[in-house]
Amino acid sequence: VKLTTPAATQKMTATFTGDVLMTPIATGETPSRVGVALVRFTPGARTHWHVHPMGQVLHVTDGTALVGTRDGAVVRARAGDTVVCSPGEEHWHGATADAFAAHLAIHESADTADGGTSPVTWLEPVSDEDYQRAQA
């Protein structure tokens, strides 16, 4: 058993739209490949489309989060709710247009072709049109 201190909070820019802060909470010790982060979104902020080869679990800690999939389905998750994104499912998540949201993001890294590991493959930004449709 060991007590750890979370890493420094980072402002996320390259694969997010709007203001998003991420605090890495923990990374499992080898052979574990689990990672946990607290992600905070300002109103209107969201991830780009992305996919987790091993899946992702989102546990909403504050506000209401939106989680959208390529088929147009949107889950509206409130504080205390948990959303499971299946392995390989392209999705995005973020805050509603008018309120803050925060969630714990839990993922597992997978082997990559170059011999490394990665928990995520980032894709293009979520269009404003797709994001607005998710507000309904």
What does each model-found stretch correspond to?
Residues 38-42, 51-67, 106-109:
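Short, conserved beta-strand element in jelly-roll/cupin
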Residues 22-24, 35-52, 87:
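Conserved short histidine dyad/triad with adjacent acidic residue
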Residues 57, 84-85, 98-121:
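A short hydrophobic beta-strand segment most commonly corresponding to one strand
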